[in-house]
Amino acid sequence: MASKSDKQVTVEVNNTGRGRSKSRARSQSRGRGRSVKITVNSQNKGRRQNGRNKRQSNQRVRNIVNKQLRKQGVTGPKPAICQKATATLGTIGSNTSGTTEIEACILLNPVLVEDATGSTQFGPVQALGAQYSMWKLKYLNVRLTSMVGASAVNGTVVRVSLNPTSTPSSTSWSGLGARKHLDVTVGKNAIFKLKPSDLGGPRDGWWLTNTNDNASDTLGPSVEIHTLGRTMSSYQNQQFTGGLFLVELASEWCFTGYAANPNLVNLVKSTDKQVNVTFEGSAGTPLVMNVPAASHFARTVAQRSTLPTSMARAGENTASDTVWQVLNTAVSAAELVTPPPFNWLVKGGWWFVKLIAGRVRNGNRSFYVYASYQDALSNKPALCTGSTSGSMRTRPAVMTTLQFTQMNQPSLGHGETPATLGRSIPTSGETLKVLLTVGNPISPNETNKQTWVNKTIEPPGAVVRIGRDTQHYCTLNGFTLITKVDWFTEEFQPSEEPAPVQGLMVLGDNHKKADVYAAQQYKNPITNDKQEVTSVFLVRVNEGFQVTNHLSYFYRNSVNTDAVENIKIRSATRHTTVRFYQGSWYLLTSTVLHTGPPVSGWLWMNQELQNDQAYIIDQGIMHLITPPPVSSQIYFEMATLVPQTRSGGGETGLELVMGLSDDEYPISHVNDEEETEYETESDEDETDEVDRFDLCCTSDSEDDIENNRVTLLSTLINQGVTVDRATMITNRAFPTPNYKPRREPSNDLLAPSDCLATARSHACNETCQLSGSRGHAE
C-alpha cells in the first residue's frame, strides 16, 4: 500500500459489484461499479525519519485511506458501539458410533449466541442485538478447553469448520476438510481463529439483526463441530461417555443503526436428552416430525410458538410463525427412518421445524420439517417423493437427544402478550380444568351394564386408602381407567401437567402405590342435617397393585318419582379382585354420608356404602351408574394442593368446594339445634354483611319468605360466597319458623338503652324454653 516514506502513496479501490474476466477489461470504463483513487503524500519534511516516525507515517497513511474509503461508502456505516464478550456455549460430547457425528452448530447472530441450558438470562451481546438493526464481527476465536487429560481417552478427533451459509448440507469428513477448518486432538486446548474476511456480511460487511428478515441477510456464517471415531476410555476397556471440550466464543461484535426489538432477547435455547422422534410422509406431502407431547422439547416449543398469522386452505394444516433449529447430537440420527428424499437432511444432524397448529395425535406433537431457514420463513416445507417401507414404518420410535434453538420472534415489541400455542406452568394450589379421556372398563365392569364399586371398608384383601396418612383418608369406591389427561387453566388455556400433590397418596397395605395429581370434593345437602360428600382423585400408579373387595352397584329405588336422590346401593355383593397397572391414569372416587351441620373445607371420612340410605347422583356418582363410553371425555375442575385439616373439627386449610348451578343446590333449613350448638363468636363479625340482607317482615307470607330465601341463597353462591356462609346469611335475613323464636326476642331488646349482651342473654333464654320439650341443652 505504501512505498518509501519520501514518495507519494496511491491507493485505488475498484468496486464493480461483480467479478469480471480479463477479456472484458475495456468494458469497465462504462462503469457499473465505483472506483476510488486516493493519493497520499507521505513525505515528512525535515530530518531523516527514524523507526518511530516511520510507524507514525504508516499509521497516518492508513487513517487517511480509511477516512476516504468511509466517505465513498465502501466500508458501510460506522459502528455505533462495539462489545467484546466471551460466550460459553456448552460442552462437546463423546463419539458413540465411530462415524461422523455433529456435536454443535453455532449460529453467530448475536441474539442466537446462547448456551443450551434453557436459561432465560441474557448477556450484553444479546441486549445490544435487540437494540440495533445491524451487526458484524471484527474477529472470532472459538476456544476449545479440554475437559479430559490427553491420556484419559483415545480414538476420537474433533474438527471445527466454518459454514459460510448457515444451511444444512450432506457433508462427509472429507467434505468438512474442504472448508476452512481446524483439527483438534482430544486432551489439548485449541483456538479456531476467524478474520473479518471470513465473517463479512452482504451489506458492506454488515448483517441484519432481526431474524424475521431474509435468512441470507441475518444469520451470518455458522461454526460446526464434528467428531470422528468412537471415544474409548484409556483406563477401562469400555466406551467413554463424558464431555470432551468446553466451547467458548471470544469475539468483538459491532452494532449500528438503533432499532429496538425487545423480544429478541427472549429467544430460547435448550436441550432434551430423552425424546422419542419419528418421521412420516408420503409422495407429494410435507415431511412431518413427531415427538411426544409430554416431552420437554414439545412443551417448550408449544409454549413459545405463536399462532399463525396466515390462513390455511381447506383441508390443510397451518404452521406456527415461530421457527426452531433442531440439532440431533446423538448417534441415533443415523437410525432415524425418514421418507425420501430427505434422508440426508436428518442424517446431517440439524434442520428447521415449525409447530403444526392444533395437531396432536396419539399423544404426539407434529412439526413441519424445512431444509433451510429461508424455506421455513417462506413456508416451504420439505416435500417427500415417497413413503417409508412397511417394515421400516413399524419400527419403534428412536430415543435421541435434541438441542433446539428458537430462531425468531414474530412479535418484537413489549406490547400485549401474543396469542400462543403454548401451555402455562401451573402453580401449587392452583385450580385446573381437567379433560379426561375414558379408557376401557376395568374388569369386572362391562359396557352398558351397571358399574361395580367397592362397597365395604373392611375388604378381604389389603385396604386401599386415598389421603394424607392412615388417620386422614378416604376409602376407595369407584374406579375408572383414563387414557389421556388434558390440563387447562381457569381461563381454559392449555397448561402443563402439574407435579404430584405433595402429601397426598394412594396407600395399599400401608405402602404408597400411586401419586395424586388433582383432587376435588363435592358436598350436596340431602336433608337439614345430612350431606352427601363425594371425593374425586386423579391418580397415576407408580407400582402396580390389586385389591380384593366386596363389590356392588347403585340402582334406582323407584320409577315413580323424578327425585335425583332416589338411588340406593345393592345389598348383595360380589367378591372379586380389581387390578391397577403401573403408569396408568385412574379416576378414583369415595362417597360418604355426613350427619350433622355442614362442614366447610375438606372432610376426611372412612365409611362404607350403606344399604338403607338413599344417595343422590352428584358430580362423582354420575359416572358410576354405567361405565362411560370408551374414548368419551369427562370434565372436572380440580385443585392441585393437599387438603389440610385443622384440629378440633374447624375449617380446613383449603376449601375445595366448587360452585354449582342454582338448581343443583337443595335449600338447607338449619334448625335451632344446629344453630345453637355450633354458633361461634366469629359470627358477630358478619353483622354488617347480614344487615344488608335483613329484609324480614312479619307481614309477609311463608311462600314469599321461602322465595326470597331461594333468591338470596342463589345470589350469594353465584357471587362466590361459600355454601355455609350463604346459608347462615340467608337464615338470618329470612328466618325459618324454627329460627324465628331466637331472632325475634333479640331484635325486640336491641333498643338504644339496652346492651347487646343483655339482648343476647334474653334471646338464649327464650330459645331454651321453646326447645326444652325436646331435651335440648344450650
From Swiss-Prot:
What ranges does the record give for the region Disordered, renumbered to this chain?
1-59, 670-689
Compositional bias annotation for Basic residues = 19-35, 45-57
Q: Which GO terms describe its biological process?
A: clathrin-dependent endocytosis of virus by host cell
- Region Acidic: what ranges? 647-778
Q: Where is this region: P2 globular domain?
A: 424-646
According to its record, what are the GO cellular component terms?
A: host extracellular space; T=3 icosahedral viral capsid
Does the entry feature the keyword Protein biosynthesis, yes or no?
Answer: no
Q: Which Pfam families match?
A: Astro_capsid_N, Astro_capsid_p
Which residue ranges does the record annotate as region Core attachment? 394-423
Basic as annotated region, ranges:
1-70
| Entry keyword set | Capsid protein, Clathrin-mediated endocytosis of virus by host, T=3 icosahedral capsid protein, Viral penetration into host cytoplasm, Virion, Virus endocytosis by host, Virus entry into host cell
UniProt lists compositionally biased (Acidic residues) regions at: 672-689
Q: Where is this region: Inner core?
A: 71-263
Q: Where is this site: Cleavage?
A: 313-314, 393-394, 423-424, 646-647, 655-656
InterPro entries documented for this protein? Astro_capsid_N (IPR004337), Astro_capsid_p (IPR022027), Viral_coat (IPR029053)
Family listed: Belongs to the astroviridae capsid polyprotein family.
Q: What is this protein called?
A: Capsid polyprotein VP90
Name the source organism: Human astrovirus-6
